[in-house]
Amino acid sequence: MARRNRRLSSASVYRYYLKRISMNIGTTGHVNGLSIAGNPEIMRAIARLSEQETYNWVTDYAPSHLAKEVVKQISGKYNIPGAYQGLLMAFAEKVLANYILDYKGEPLVEIHHNFLWELMQRQSGAGLGVTSGFIYTFVRKDGKPVTVDMSKVLTEIEDALFKLVKK
């Protein structure tokens, strides 16, 4: 099962904070290079902005990691190759953002259908053959073919995410 309590080290958070400070100084420096160097108020504003950006990054990290862990687990269960796992991770993150974190974008059914359409566009590559729009045949590591209904996989990802956050 995916771990809910994935934590970042304080060193990671500090590195990210310093990165944001340097990026914000660089951006502001292109506009007003001389006024930054002598004005402590601008430096405080940059520090506050960087702190806010770091907080947003930290709060978005855990749900994103949770979505990726759920997809890895379900992909392993169905022997889905890595070429398709990236799309499934994007799907899980979108479901998480729109329905669990309440960003409220497109409806869940629409997200589901859009990702099925996107999967249909990627028929070449890792799949051996496609018997229907949503049914894929993949080759396992031992060489045996496995048939997977991608609509069922997407539904299982949705259910696992909703179960993990108890919504």
UniProtKB/Swiss-Prot annotation:
Gene Ontology CC entries for this record: helical viral capsid
Domain of life where this protein originates: Viruses
Subcellular localization: Virion
Gene: SIFV0035
Main location: virion
Assembly, per entry: Heterodimer composed of major capsid protein 1 and major capsid protein 2.
Function: Self-assembles to form a helical, filamentous nucleocapsid mesuring 1980 nm in length and 24 nm in width. Together with capsid protein 1, wraps arounds the DNA and maintains it in an A-form. Capsid proteins probably maintain the DNA in A-form by non-specific desolvation and specific coordination of the DNA phosphate groups by positively charged residues. This certainly protects the viral DNA under conditions such as the extreme desiccation of its host.
GO molecular function, one term: DNA binding
Name recorded for this polypeptide: Major capsid protein 2
Organism of provenance: Sulfolobus islandicus filamentous virus (isolate Iceland/Hveragerdi) (SIFV)
Transmembrane domains' residue ranges: none
Keyword field: DNA-binding, Virion
Recorded domain comment: The N-terminus projects into a DNA groove.
Keyword set includes DNA-binding: yes
Key word DNA-binding present: yes
